[in-house]
Each structure stands twice: as C-alpha cells, then as structure tokens.
Amino acid sequence: MFAIRSSVRRFTSSLSSQTLIAVQARPASKLYRQRRSTNAPVPAIMQNGPKKHFDGKRKKAKVDKNNKSSGHDEVLLCDINQLLKRNETEQAETNGDSVPFSLPEKFTEIDVKISELSSTGDGLALAENGKYVYVVPFTVPGDTVRVKLVKHFESLSYSLTDFVKVIEPGPQRNDALIGCKYFGECSGCQLQMMSYEDQLAHKRRIVEKAYANFSGLIPELIPTIGETFASPMQFGYRTKLTPHFAHGGAGKGSKQDGEEPSQPQVPPIGFTYKNRRLDMDIEDCPLGTDIVRRGLTSERKRVAENIRSYKRGATLLMRESTARIPKDAAPTADGETPNVGGIAATPNADTGDVIRIERENYIEEKRCITDNNATSFEYVDDYIFSNKAGAFFQNNNSILSGFTEYIRSQAIPAGNDQDAKPIKYLLDAYSGSGLFTITLSPLFKSSLGVDIGGDSIVSARENARANNLPNTGFAAADAATLFKEVPYPPDQTLLVIDPPRKGCSEDFLRQMLDFKPRRVVYVSCNVHTQARDIAVMVQGDEKQNVRYEIESVRGFDFFPQTGHVEGVAILNRTSFPQAEAV
C-alpha cells in the first residue's frame, strides 16, 4: 500500500500557482440559508433511526446471501408494508367490510389490478381483503392482468407472481414502445412499456421514497428532490454486456468404445428469466451499443463452435472500446488495433468487428473487447480513460458528459472566490480509474484520488498522464482509513464519494466526520444506502461539533428501461448551534 502523503508530494511539489475556476452552484436550501444567518436552533433531526446496513436479518424468506448490498428485498418489503398501511387506513376511514380471503395455491392463475409501481420496478396488487399483496413484474398502475403465483411469503404478506397477459391496460401502458422480443420474460428490463417521461417521473419518486423511508430524517431536512436527469439514449446505450451460460460441453457426447463423439448441445446463452434460476437464450439485446450487439452475435457463435472446450459454464464479456484517429493521421489497417492516447492497446483481444464513425476532426473506431484483462478505451468529452475491460466503469457513455458537467457545476459553492479560505482541493474516495478526479481536476489547485484497488490506481495514473494533468495524483489505500494521511486542509477540501452498492462503512463515515471536509458530493448507485449514509452525516458528531446539511439531491437515469436510478447529493458542513446562556 502506498503512503498517501508521499504520493501527493510527488505531484504537488512542482505545482505553480494557478487560477481557481469558480463555478456557480445552485443556492443552498432555504433551511440551510436560514440557519447560517440566524443560528436558529436545530429541530429534532430524526423521526426514527436510519436503516441499518442491509443484512437480510429482518427477512424470514430466503434471500441470496451473496447479494447483501443491493437491499432489493428490503426495498420491496418497505413498499409493500406502506401500501398495506395506507389501504388499512382508507378502509378504516370508510368503514369498509372485511372480505374473506384464502391464498390461492402456487401456480394458480388469477386476475389482479395493479395499485402502484414499487421502487424495484415491480407492480403491486392488493388481494381482495386488502391485507395481502401480489408482486407482479412488467406492469404499470391501473393494469388489470392475469398472473401465475410462483412463490408465497405468507409471513410477510406477499407473493411473487409471473406476468401472463394484460386483461385491461392502465393509462401508463403503451406496448408499442416495447423494443425487445424478450421483454416480459427476461429479468434485465422492467419499464419498456412506459413512456420515457413516465420512467423519469417514477425514478424521481424512487429517490423521494428512499430518503423518506431509509434515512429516518424529518422531512424538513430533506430538500425537494430534483427532476431525474435523462439519458440522451434510451436504447443502444450499454457499453458492456455480460451474458452467461450454465454448463459446458466437455464430457457430453464424448468418444466411447471407439465411437465418434456426438455434438454436445449448446446451452442457453444470455440472461436469467424473471423469478427463475434459469437462463434465457438471448440472441440480441437492444440496450447494447451497436458494436456490443455485434460482439454478442460473434461470441455466441464462437461459444457454440467451441462448446466442447468448456468444462463448465462461463460469463462472457462484451465491452465497447473507442479509438479516435485524427483524419490527417495514417489510415489504420482493417483489424489492426490502434495505439490510443499514447497507451498501448491489447492485440487480439476483440471480436474482430469494427464500426467506424466519421466526426468533424477524427474518425471513431469502435471494437468489442472480450478479454477481461485487455485494455478498453472510452472518451468523456475530450478526456480519455483506459481500463481493464472487465473492471468497473460506467456503462452508459451517452449520459457521462452531462453527468460530469452537472457535478462540475455543483463542486464549488457560490461565492467561493470571495471566501477567505476558498475550496481549492479535491479528495476523491472510491476513485476507481479516475472519472471524477480527472474531469473535476481543472477546478482545483490539487486533486487526489484514492482507491483500494491497485489495478484501478494503475489505470488512473495512466489516465492522468494521458490527459496531461500534473496537478492530479492517485494513491492505493483502503477508503476506510484514507483520511489519516490526507494532506489537504479540510476547510478548503471538496470530498467526492462514490461507494459500491452497499454504501459507506460506519468506520469511513466516522473518519469523514473527524476530517470535516467543507463540502461533499455523494454519488451513489443505490439511493437507499445513500439515504442511510447521509442520515449519519446529517446527525453528525456533537463532540466534534460537526454535521452536514443537504443542499440538493437528484437522480440520474443511467439505465433507461430498467427500475434502476443513480443519485447525486450535495452536502455542506455546518456546526451544532450554541446553547443560549440562561
């Protein structure tokens, strides 16, 4: 592990003074402005405790023990319980009579009407007695649909069902919008039958419910959730697909007693069915970019031709890689992998498919990388990023320009250039290969990205060099202990955090409160764990006299047609009010 301080010295020692580019941020919330000006007493912060880490303990039903970070079951159960509670209140107010109810047996088909859409993207339908819920995929509020019951969770008052057909469509359903022949069975998408406008509104509601239900904060401390930032592309946006198959062909149809071996059967290659542990054979996925879709076709053919060489199943990789070749440069021979941004590409690591797109000053060449350890290249505006193809990088390139521009616009508070101690340092925790450190770098005198992954730091340093950013450094360290050696004054530091789905550890949040960065940008792929973590920051540490106030929260639609939404929250450091003398 590299020492953070020595790593920073290597790139800060040669820095000359430079002009800090101040970008106007949105005004702080009304509550924040009022407290700063009047030192008004802070009201009770919590209406109940924030949700704990999603460990599955409250669920009596069996869950995937390897997927503790997603919180899918807890989020679904929260929506179910709230629907039941609202219905119970309505029945009490109208003196509704109790209706006898007998839970149908598994695999029975029944007709139900969808009451609402859950944060998981599933429809929720009340049983006749109003005290039990059917979870129905691929539906919208108002739909009357036929479903097949597949799994009961009686102690939790709900059952999972398979969608069979629409009896009467709800007002938000438009099946003409469905762009995939597998929709309705594949678990990958949930919302293709909804207009994009309705999808964005639904995702805004997901963020609202996350903060209302999982933070425990009183409503006055949660700003109005901003409108969901739209993806420029709603199909054809995914730069990475990872289909899989369950078993290989080795040992099947093998030669015995001198006989010629029979051709082994090729298993389904694709994604899982909804509500089943079975794979669908997926020939094409319209969410993938053009080159990724070509790669899927090529890889399916390759696997089928070589299935006997697989002893077991496997997960395949299709990752888009982009090269920009100046028009005045020598033309690239067909099939030859170019050198991109001064970083050597990996030969023989792609499917051989090439798509060329002519731009004003250059030609883009797109290839589909299939080797997890090969280098892939991606551009965000004019910034170039190289990564191991199997490593994490955002999968929707079409939204990244607007996404990073939004964060740049929020990074520096209004009036920063007039402050006696302006923010001029960036600390990027969970930095990965440097997306935020690099795209925010022009705003700061010095920027430091930290990540636990050694491979990510290697890529990040290469990316800083390729983008000619001498004021940007990276260090390998555990994010839970990174604050111990940060060389920046907290009063002048912006902290960016982008943790995995499970959110920040309690130790990380405790150390962050000890460090006291002046401003925080919290980016999250799980708005429910984000809400939980931000509640800890808002509660603060009274002994350290530090807490945070939420300036803004907004969702970003990285994955159109799915129930997933990412969140960006901006927070400002403040202190506890001083008790008035008696």
Where are these regions (language model features)?
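N-terminal mitochondrial targeting presequence
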Residues: 1-46
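Rossmann-like S-adenosyl-L-methionine
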Residues: 31-34, 47-53, 58-59, 64-91, ...
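Terminal RNA-binding accessory module
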Residues: 33, 38-178, 182
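Short, acidic/hydrophobic/Gly-rich beta-strand patch recurrent on exposed beta strands
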Residues: 123-128, 268-274, 460
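Hydrophobic beta-strand signal
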Residues: 146-148, 242, 317
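Short, low-complexity Ser/Thr-rich regulatory SLiMs
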Residues: 151-153, 245-249, 320-322, 557, ...
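Extended interfacial segments that mediate partner engagement and assembly in macromolecular machines
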Residues: 167-178, 184-304
